[in-house]
């Protein structure tokens, strides 16, 4: 039985060791981690097969996120190498000045310390998060879902092999083995040892952590993302963007879950939009029975505007203009990613200014809300919080700062 407190004490100690490493030393370890993941690919895939063998009861979207193969494992290793190549400002001077007493004050970037990450079903998160935390000089403590337990253990063993090669403590990357709710409850109260907690997963997990954690949290909440098609939109562009935002990966948190359509486009554009969605086997959920009766087919239904479907299901609401669209997003959006398709520059700027979300798009798919697409290599999560980080969280989001003050005997 794992002693969580003992493990976290060692993790806290490891943070001091990790902070002393140079950027070049951290990069060398990351390269070794990538090599170990590739060399243990067969072992990792066998462990994943164990998880998949008891995953029949899971939704299809979750099973897809859970499944690994040799291509995905090699992609995980490549992602770690990409992270090693990224710039990291840890230990660098942000700014410096002299105060009226003659003190030299320097603001220096530093790691946060020990970062806990709670996540579900995606084994690649184990390697991505470990790499981002290690690159930024942070220790990470992982709490994966029980559905990916064997996969995560196998990946962790590969990472520990690399740490051992470089004479570093394995607690630089640790995992909470207790997969129960009681285990999560114990973990989220360990503020004595953990500096930041990042929960990423379903609404139930986020709410549980929010209401029980004593550790400061940055939440990766659900993605109820909208695409608003304004009356001035290039309609071919609108079709392409909507189809990409919904279909390129329906289970992603940055997938579109609701289309807002200006009412003047109903007669000329809605039939074409519905045809394209149905050709792709998308179920359309309408605002009320009248819309469903007039425009729906057998598989369609009534909208749930608060729901993250994570599937080939899409809410549709007709609005009378940008004010109603903005009001709808303000009420039902999850502060993740929102997009408008428009040729009207004034409307575009209004949307960008007034939508309260981590990522706000004009004439582009919400699917770009991703650490890799933003040039961060990967992401620890996509923050829907406003403090300390927002949007895709890369290396720089895992840093804080301290003030280094030099004097020559000043007293106050």
From Swiss-Prot:
GO cellular component: cytoplasm
UniProt keyword terms in alphabetical order: Amino-acid biosynthesis, Cytoplasm, NADP, Oxidoreductase, Proline biosynthesis
GO molecular function, one term: NADP binding
Location(s) in or outside the cell: Cytoplasm
InterPro entries the record matches: Ald_DH/histidinol_DH, Ald_DH_C, Ald_DH_N, Aldehyde_DH_dom, G-glutamylP_reductase_CS, Glu-5-SA_DH, GPR_dom
Pathway: Amino-acid biosynthesis; L-proline biosynthesis; L-glutamate 5-semialdehyde from L-glutamate: step 2/2
Pfam family, one: Aldedh
Class of the enzyme per the UniProt entry, highest EC level: oxidoreductase
Alphabetical list of PROSITE patterns matching this protein: PROA (PS01223)
Signal peptide feature range: none
Keyword Cytoplasm: yes
Keyword Cytoplasm among UniProt keywords: yes
GO biological process, one term: L-proline biosynthetic process
Source superkingdom: Bacteria
Principal subcellular localization: cytoplasm
Reactions accelerated catalytically: L-glutamate 5-semialdehyde + phosphate + NADP(+) = L-glutamyl 5-phosphate + NADPH + H(+)
Record-listed E.C. numbers: 1.2.1.41
PANTHER family associated with the record: DELTA-1-PYRROLINE-5-CARBOXYLATE SYNTHASE, GLUTAMATE SEMIALDEHYDE DEHYDROGENASE
Family: Belongs to the gamma-glutamyl phosphate reductase family.
Record's function text: Catalyzes the NADPH-dependent reduction of L-glutamate 5-phosphate into L-glutamate 5-semialdehyde and phosphate. The product spontaneously undergoes cyclization to form 1-pyrroline-5-carboxylate.
Protein name in UniProt: Gamma-glutamyl phosphate reductase
Protein's organism: Helicobacter hepaticus (strain ATCC 51449 / 3B1)
């Amino acid at each position: 039985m794992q002693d969580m407190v003992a493990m976290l004490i060692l993790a806290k100690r490891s943070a001091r060791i990790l902070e002393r490493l140079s950027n070049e030393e951290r990069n060398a370890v990351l390269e070794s981690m990538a090599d170990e993941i590739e060399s243990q690919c067969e072992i990792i895939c066998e462990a994943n097969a164990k998880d998949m063998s008891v995953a029949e009861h899971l939704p299809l979207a979750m099973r897809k996120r859970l499944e690994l193969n040799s291509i995905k494992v090699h992609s995980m290793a490549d992602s770690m190498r990409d992270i090693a190549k990224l710039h990291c400002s840890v230990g660098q001077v942000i700014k410096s000045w002299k105060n009226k007493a003659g003190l030299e004050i320097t603001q220096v970037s530093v790691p946060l310390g020990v970062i806990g990450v709670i996540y579900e079903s995606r084994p690649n998160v184990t390697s991505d998060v470990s790499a981002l935390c290690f690159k930024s000089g942070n220790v990470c403590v992982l709490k994966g879902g029980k559905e990916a337990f064997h996969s995560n253990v196998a990946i962790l063993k590969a990472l520990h092999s690399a740490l051992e090669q470089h004479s570093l403590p394995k607690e630089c990357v640790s995992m909470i083995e207790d997969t129960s709710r009681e285990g999560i409850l114990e973990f989220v109260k360990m503020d004595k040892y953990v500096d930041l907690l990042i929960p990423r997963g379903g609404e139930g997990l986020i709410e549980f952590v929010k209401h029980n954690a004593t550790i400061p949290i940055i939440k990766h909440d659900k993605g109820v993302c909208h695409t608003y098609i304004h009356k001035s939109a290039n309609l071919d562009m609108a079709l392409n963007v909507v189809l990409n935002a919904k279909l390129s990966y329906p289970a992603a948190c940055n997938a579109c879950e609701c289309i807002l359509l200006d009412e003047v486009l109903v007669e000329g554009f809605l039939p074409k939009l519905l045809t394209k969605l149905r050709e792709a086997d998308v179920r359309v959920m309408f605002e009320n029975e009248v819309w469903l009766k007039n425009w729906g087919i057998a598989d369609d239904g009534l909208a749930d505007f608060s729901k993250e479907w994570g599937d080939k299901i899409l809410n549709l609401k007709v609005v009378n203009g940008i004010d109603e669209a903005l009001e709808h997003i303000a009420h039902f959006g999850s502060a993740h990613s929102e997009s408008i398709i428009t040729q009207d520059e004034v409307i575009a700027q209004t949307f960008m200014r007034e939508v309260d979300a981590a990522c706000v798009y004009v004439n582009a798919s919400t699917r770009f809300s991703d650490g890799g697409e933003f040039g961060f290599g990967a992401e620890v999560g996509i923050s829907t919080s406003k403090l300390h980080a927002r949007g895709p969280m890369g290396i720089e989001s895992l840093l804080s700062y301290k003030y280094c003050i030099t004097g020559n005997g000043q007293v106050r």
